[in-house]
Every structure is written in C-alpha cells, then in structure tokens.
C-alpha cells in the first residue's frame, strides 16, 4: 500500500461544482492512504497574485514532506508545463506561471523541475 501522504489544495476552483471532489477522487484511487486538506479553493479566479499570497501564508504551518498542489492558472489548457518544486521541507506542484514566486523568495533551498509527459 502507498505511504500516507499529506496533500494540500490551493485552487481557484470554488466549491460549487465537482472539480475539487474529482481531483480528490483521482488521488484516492492512486493512494487511498492520502490525507487531503483544503487550504483554500476560493482563490479569486485566475488571480495568480491571490494564489501566491494564499500559499505563501499557509504552507509553512504544515509538516515536512507535505505536497502542496497550487492550481490557479489563467492559461489552463495551454502548452505551459507544470512544475515540481522541492524545498528543504516542502513539495509543490503548480503551473509555471508565477504562483509560487513568493515561495521562491522565502526558501533558500529550491529544486525546480518541469514535469513532462513520458
């Protein structure tokens, strides 16, 4: 069985449709032991700065090895590749659009990788 993993969501999806629930369902199919916490699904639509401020204020309060999924992207569906960013303590998955810019400013140790298919 996969290891238990704490995963946070910071999105502009809102809570009036199926998108957040669908994402959680996919994660639980892959790892039924995952724990998912919503930091905020009410980031202003397509507002990268609002998303950046939200995750920057919250992530530091979570345990080491938490995976933070930050999905605020006015270019969704474009050719923009997602990023996998690791710091000394945290892991981030987000679009390459600046939504993690404040995390970059606060963390000294960063590894940034584009995720590609294959």
Predicted regions, residues:
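N-terminal glycine-rich anion-binding loop in soluble enzyme alpha/beta folds
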Residues: 4-45
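Active-site histidine-anchored catalytic micro-motif
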Residues: 4-6, 30-32, 36, 46-53, ...
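Short HxH-centered metal-ligating active-site micro-motif
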Residues: 58
């Amino acid at each position: 069985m996969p290891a238990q993993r704490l995963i946070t969501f910071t999105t502009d999806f809102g809570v009036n449709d199926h998108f957040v629930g669908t994402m959680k369902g996919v994660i639980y199919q892959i790892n039924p032991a995952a724990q998912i916490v919503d930091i905020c699904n009410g980031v202003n639509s397509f507002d990268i700065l609002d998303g950046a401020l939200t995750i920057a204020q919250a992530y530091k309060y979570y345990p080491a090895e938490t995976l933070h999924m930050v999905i605020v992207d006015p270019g969704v569906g474009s050719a923009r590749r997602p990023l996998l960013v690791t710091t000394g303590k945290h892991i981030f998955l987000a679009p390459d659009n600046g939504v993690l810019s404040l995390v970059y400013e606060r963390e000294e140790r960063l590894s940034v990788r584009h995720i590609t298919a294959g």
